[in-house]
From Swiss-Prot:
Deubiquitinating enzyme that functions as a negative regulator of the innate immune system. Has peptidase activity towards 'Lys-48'- and 'Lys-63'-linked polyubiquitin chains. Can also cleave 'Lys-11'-linked ubiquitin chains (in vitro). Acts via TRAF3 deubiquitination and subsequent suppression of type I interferon (IFN) production. Controls neuroectodermal differentiation through cleaving 'Lys-48'-linked ubiquitin chains to counteract degradation of select chromatin regulators such as ARID1A, HDAC2 and HCF1. This is OTU domain-containing protein 5. Belongs to the peptidase C85 family. GO terms for molecular function: cysteine-type deubiquitinase activity; deubiquitinase activity; K48-linked deubiquitinase activity; K63-linked deubiquitinase activity. Its EC number is 3.4.19.12. It catalyses: Thiol-dependent hydrolysis of ester, thioester, amide, peptide and isopeptide bonds formed by the C-terminal Gly of ubiquitin (a 76-residue protein attached to proteins as an intracellular targeting signal). The active site is at D221, C224 (nucleophile), H329. The modification Phosphotyrosine is found at Y175. Residues 34-47, 105-115 have a biased composition (Gly residues). Interacts with TRAF3.
Length: 566
């Protein structure tokens, strides 16, 4: 078999469709063609390929993803983007699908502008016909958008007869997202910041007003897709590493199915995707939809999802919602009125939002108990203040009552003495009463409770038990005064001679008997337990001294005989 030399690359303005097909056979067999790719990728067909319609030799650019759903054609047909194989042709490997291909619905955008529907190519050679099945579809790079395919950068020349050139092989064998970063950066630079901001604001407002959804911003570090899914499943975007690890493990366990959608080596693809800064695409979305058994809805500047990925089993679980911004970044779309955290983790008897409701009930119960305890404490404080106020009022009433009783006793004593009482004795009694009143006021101010309990007229039981009347101030002073050394056996305190019957103390003996009786009583009955002994003695001695001097003067007057005038 003769191998012709490579054909020189045509100039950029040349039309490949007008070039005549070169003579010679095609290579006997291409390298393994990857299946219809959803994660973005090249055709993956090794040798030169011929388009039956155009007659152009060379690799075809990637095509958009096929629509999901029933396709026209007889039963058993591969897909509408696969052409019929001529009789006698040898068909290439056919992907075995275990679940629906991870692609959008018929209504979703299938590819970017200028993308054409892919088709299998048939090359006719001298030794036979070889068909390579699987012109793969690119849906974006590591952060490629949903439904947007990215064309692979190709060499200036087109593959010639006899197989692809080394330059072509080097460019065509790249991984699915080789043009992600340069193309995304170029698109972002070409956008007007004001327009982008206005569009983002409209998108967020439309979702909130029409659907009630809220867009949660994810960190732009290359793991935005996994962060958005982690926020939906675990409620914490920082668990994106766990989501990525589970997703990659799931892809490896189902490599026989997902490898048909990747043009590069599947192990190399998985190892690259395990890096935390590598973005995700539709392959990972389909894997996570199956892994968590929840649909994945993608929103892009619309209130309706532009793409939905379904799991193997249909259920009523809330879908995982993500939003796609500027063709390079994913955010999480949450429904604040319906809890979805924990759904899809396989937890038995798990009810979304039940934990929050339980915590809320416990918080309300604790708050109510704390409020009740606080109110009880306030009630106790108010009751204590009320009791203290009542006690103060009672003490004040008792004090005023006792002072009034003292005034009444003094008034009665004045009425009993009558106008014949000497002024000096009246002054002495008044001074004694004033001293007693001042002493009593001082005593009541120091110990009102004990005074009221012992000497107040509110306690008649004590006086009735002892068989005595409440002592008057004069009587108290008289009892405390020691007997006068000059008093013979009978003496008068306030008047002399004929006024003995009107005196409170007629003789010393009743006073001594009363004094002995009082000494047998407890001092607390008179409220004397809080008095200072020195002050009492000083007051009593002063009054006694004054009365003693007065009595001495009176006795001297009575004893001196009148001078004999004869």
């Amino acid at each position: 078999m003769t191998i012709l030399p490579k054909k020189k690359p045509p100039p950029p303005d040349a039309d490949p469709a007008n070039e005549p097909p070169p003579p010679g056979p095609l290579p006997p067999a291409p390298r393994r063609g990857a299946g219809v790719g959803v994660g973005g990728g090249g055709t993956g067909v090794g040798g030169g390929e011929r388009d039956r319609d155009s007659g152009v030799v060379g690799a075809r650019p990637r095509a958009s993803p096929p629509p999901q759903g029933p396709l026209p054609g007889p039963p058993g047909a591969l897909h509408r983007w696969a052409l019929a194989v001529p009789p006698g042709a040898v068909a290439g490997p056919r992907p075995q699908q275990a679940s629906p291909p991870p692609c959008g619905g018929p209504g979703g955008p299938g590819g970017g502008p200028g993308d054409a529907l892919g088709a299998t190519t048939a090359g006719v050679g001298a030794a036979g016909v070889v068909v390579g099945v699987g012109g793969t579809v690119g849906v974006g790079g590591c952060c490629s958008g949903p439904g947007h395919s990215k064309r692979r950068r190709q060499a200036p020349g087109v593959g010639a007869v006899g197989g692809a050139s080394p330059e072509r092989e080097e460019v065509g064998a790249g991984y699915n997202s080789e043009d992600e970063y340069e193309a995304a950066a170029a698109r972002i630079e070409a956008m007007d910041p004001a327009t982008v901001e206005q569009q983002e604001h409209w998108f967020e407002k439309a979702l909130r007003d029409k659907k009630g959804f809220i867009i949660k911003q994810m960190k732009e570090d290359g793991a935005c897709l996994f962060r958005a899914v982690a926020d939906q499943v675990y409620g914490d975007q920082d668990m994106h590493e766990v989501v990525r690890k589970h997703c990659m493990d799931y892809l490896m366990k189902n490599a026989d199915y997902f490898s048909n959608y990747v043009t590069e080596d599947f192990t190399t693809y998985i190892n690259r995707k395990r890096k935390n800064n590598c973005h995700g695409n539709h392959i990972e979305m389909q894997a996570m939809a199956e892994m968590y058994n929840r649909p994945v809805e993608v929103y892009q500047y619309s209130t309706e999802p532009i793409n939905t990925f379904h799991g193997i089993h249909q259920n009523e679980d809330e879908p995982i919602r993500v939003s796609y911004h500027r063709n390079i970044h994913y955010n999480s779309v949450v429904n604040p009125n319906k809890a979805t955290i924990g759904v899809g983790l396989g937890l038995p008897s798990f009810k979304p939002g039940f934990a929050e409701q339980s915590l809320m009930k416990n918080a309300i119960k604790t708050s109510e108990e704390s409020w009740i305890e606080q109110q009880m404490l306030e009630d106790k404080k108010r009751a204590t203040d009320w009791e203290a106020t009542n006690e103060a009022i009672e003490e004040q009433v008792a004090r005023e009552s006792y002072l009034q009783w003292l005034r009444d006793q003094e008034k009665q004593a004045r009425q009993v003495r009558g106008p014949s009482q000497p002024r000096k004795a009246s002054a002495t009694c008044s001074s004694a009463t004033a001293a007693a009143s001042s002493g009593l006021e001082e005593w009541t101010s120091r110990s009102p409770r004990q005074r009221s309990s012992a000497s107040s007229p509110e306690h008649p039981e004590l006086h009735a038990e002892l068989g005595i009347k409440p002592p008057s101030p004069g009587t108290v002073l008289a009892l405390a005064k020691p007997p006068s050394p000059c008093a013979p056996g009978t003496s008068s305190q306030f008047s002399a001679g004929g006024d003995r019957a009107t005196s409170p103390l007629v003789s010393l003996y009743p006073a001594l008997e009363c004094r002995a009786l009082i000494q047998q009583m407890s001092p607390s009955a008179f409220g004397l337990n809080d008095w200072d002994d020195d002050e009492i003695l000083a007051s009593v001695l002063a009054v006694s001294q004054q009365e003693y001097l007065d009595s001495m003067k009176k006795n001297k007057v009575h004893r001196e005989p009148p001078p004999d005038k004869s």
